[in-house]
């Protein structure tokens, strides 16, 4: 497979660290992702409350959609921008923007202000998650990458667990729903300070002005227009438009033209393309990207619509609906750690991905049976199956893509993977919302048709009214789960495309596995504490400790 040569103007940022320093860096990334995931998963629990408070019953899905769209747009850019400006500078900057955006969410006085702040949160938060993976790939060899990324998983899942609980708690406090954002903002500031001190950094070889010239501005602009136009259009018909109106058709047309322009720019014009099209010429990578998209769809649709199912159909409390997310997210930490250890010891990633996708398919099919009378034990077991599937497949897919591409493409491949994951998540939310509202429009009794415009806030209905609309809600939510099941089927088809050839399947430029320790400055984990890892003099620093000098291994002192 031929690969486009990456310009050498990009400064080297790979810096394998000694074990003790490596653990500190990984734990720092874990703390940051803990904070990000509290915000990410706490919002869905608060949607009905926010809708009532701000009078946003007709548009409250945009609290999540605006964040996901912004995350998707900017996830395309962070990989290449970090190649140009450096990982640490971009990472810390994103944390500061995230903290300011969270504060703005807490002080939002209108739906539009809230959605704007959520978009800013998505633009920065998506970059933080994206760069966390890229930074980890800089400091850990491919063979150990799954193992150390599994160390980060508990922080992410803990944030996923704490998010709904904290959100439900503050919703009942005098701070109301605003308290969640007022809590996260200072945590973001502390994370920025911590990351600024601890994370390794490199000194760019060019000036800031020279680096600005390298940015693929045309590609960035056209990709933004294409993504925003598409996402706004697909979120509209079920919620805001009576069918495919002229506005929707116009948005899709503009998006299509922008997408074609983006492809041409990346193919012919860009010196440092945002997404090198050569990676899509690798069948294995293309299949894995498709699976990443569908995995994101199913996972995010569950995170957003399980609370809707619990509160609006089953009439369970926000606390119970938050607890109901435990099976789908808490189990991921254990499964991710097991998968990481397995990949490090076996040198294979295929088994965990195949097992995860199979369980995701089974769980999604079983989920279509959720209804008003479904036993809670059945609900919990099905969500556990889906959680195990996501945990087994999600991070190993990153390793698989990196195993099929060059080291010089590492950041953009990781960025592309996150783009497809976020795009799948965004489509999962907005398309599921459109399906929900479209079904309600055709299923609700005539006296309750108006509820199709505000399906997320039913607090004002009495028990008789709730019983009258329950069949329509049951049908609408089932249609949402059927769409997720279809996405799971598509995800399973990707298993027949790629092969697991182990870490040795990568181009020779990428062979930084553990077996190549003498040539690459990598050694086995149990020997890392007695080794000093050195690189070319690229002014790489770890906090206040330097890690420069030539690329070689020295034992002891």
From Swiss-Prot:
Flavoprotein among keywords: no
Entry's transmembrane regions: 22-42, 59-79, 89-109, 120-140, 150-170, 179-199, 217-237, 245-265, 269-289, 319-339, 346-366, 379-399, 419-439, 479-499
Ranges of compositional bias, category Basic and acidic residues: 505-523
Sorted UniProt keywords: Membrane, Transmembrane, Transmembrane helix, Transport
SUPFAM superfamilies referenced in this protein's UniProt entry, alphabetically: MFS general substrate transporter (SSF103473)
Localization per record: Membrane
Pfam families according to UniProt: MFS_1
GO cellular component, one term: plasma membrane
Membrane topology: Multi-pass membrane protein
Magnesium keyword on record: no
Region of interest (Disordered), ranges: 505-557
Molecular function GO labels: transmembrane transporter activity
Family label: Belongs to the major facilitator superfamily. TCR/Tet family.
Known role: MFS-type transporter; part of the gene cluster that mediates the biosynthesis of squalestatin S1 (SQS1, also known as zaragozic acid A), a heavily oxidized fungal polyketide that offers potent cholesterol lowering activity by targeting squalene synthase (SS).
Protein name: MFS-type transporter clz4
Gene symbol of the encoding locus: clz4
């Amino acid at each position: 497979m031929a690969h486009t040569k990456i310009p050498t103007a990009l400064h080297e940022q790979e810096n394998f660290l000694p074990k003790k320093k490596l653990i500190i860096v990984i734990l720092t990334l874990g703390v940051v992702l803990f904070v990000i995931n509290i915000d990410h998963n706490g919002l869905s629990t608060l949607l009905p409350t926010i809708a009532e408070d701000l009078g946003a019953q007709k548009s409250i899905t945009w609290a999540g959609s605006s964040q996901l769209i912004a995350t998707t747009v900017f996830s395309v850019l962070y990989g290449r921008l970090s190649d140009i400006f450096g990982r640490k500078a971009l990472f810390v900057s994103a944390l500061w923007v995230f903290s300011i955006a969270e504060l703005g969410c807490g002080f939002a006085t209108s739906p539009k202000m809230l959605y704007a702040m959520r978009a800013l949160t998505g633009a920065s938060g998506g970059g933080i998650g994206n760069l966390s993976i890229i930074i980890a790939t800089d400091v850990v060899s491919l063979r150990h990458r799954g193992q150390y990324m599994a160390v980060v998983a508990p922080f992410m899942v803990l944030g996923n667990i704490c998010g709904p609980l904290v959100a439900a708690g503050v919703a009942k406090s005098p701070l109301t729903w605003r308290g969640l954002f007022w809590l996260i903002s200072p945590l973001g500031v502390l994370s920025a300070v911590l990351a600024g001190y601890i994370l390794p950094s490199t000194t760019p070889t060019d000036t800031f002005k020279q680096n600005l010239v390298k940015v693929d501005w045309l590609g960035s602009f056209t990709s933004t227009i294409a993504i925003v136009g598409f996402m706004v259009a697909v979120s509209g018909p079920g919620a805001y438009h009576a069918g495919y109106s002229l506005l929707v058709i116009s948005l899709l047309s503009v998006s299509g033209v922008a997408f074609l322009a983006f492809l041409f720019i990346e193919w012919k014009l860009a010196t440092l393309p945002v997404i090198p099209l050569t990676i899509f010429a690798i069948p294995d990578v293309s299949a894995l990207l498709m699976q990443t998209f569908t995995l994101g769809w199913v996972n995010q649709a569950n995170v957003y619509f399980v609370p809707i199912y619990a509160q609006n159909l089953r009439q369970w409390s926000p606390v119970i609906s938050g607890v109901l997310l435990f099976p789908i997210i808490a189990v991921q930490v254990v499964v991710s750690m097991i998968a990481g250890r397995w990949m490090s010891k076996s040198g294979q990633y295929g088994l965990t991905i195949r097992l995860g996708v199979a369980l995701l398919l089974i769980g999604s099919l079983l989920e279509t049976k959720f209804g008003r009378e479904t036993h809670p034990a059945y609900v919990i077991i099905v969500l556990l199956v889906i959680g195990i599937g996501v945990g087994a497949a999600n991070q190993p897919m990153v390793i698989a893509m990196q195993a099929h591409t060059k080291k010089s493409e590492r950041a953009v491949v990781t960025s592309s993977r996150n783009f497809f994951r976020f795009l799948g998540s965004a489509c999962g939310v907005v398309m599921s919302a459109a399906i929900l509202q479209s079904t309600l429009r055709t299923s609700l009794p005539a006296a309750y048709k108006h509820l199709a415009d505000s399906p997320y806030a039913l607090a004002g209905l009495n028990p008789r009214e709730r019983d009258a609309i329950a069949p329509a809600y049951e049908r609408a939510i089932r249609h949402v789960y059927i769409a997720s099941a279809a996405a799971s089927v598509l995800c399973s088809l990707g298993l027949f495309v790629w092969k697991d050839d182990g870490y040795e399947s990568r181009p020779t430029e990428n062979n930084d596995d553990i077996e190549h320790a003498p040539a690459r400055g990598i050694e086995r984990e149990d020997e890392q504490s007695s080794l000093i890892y050195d690189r070319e003099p690229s002014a790489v620093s770890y906090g206040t400790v330097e890690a420069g000098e030539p690329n070689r291994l020295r034992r002891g002192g």
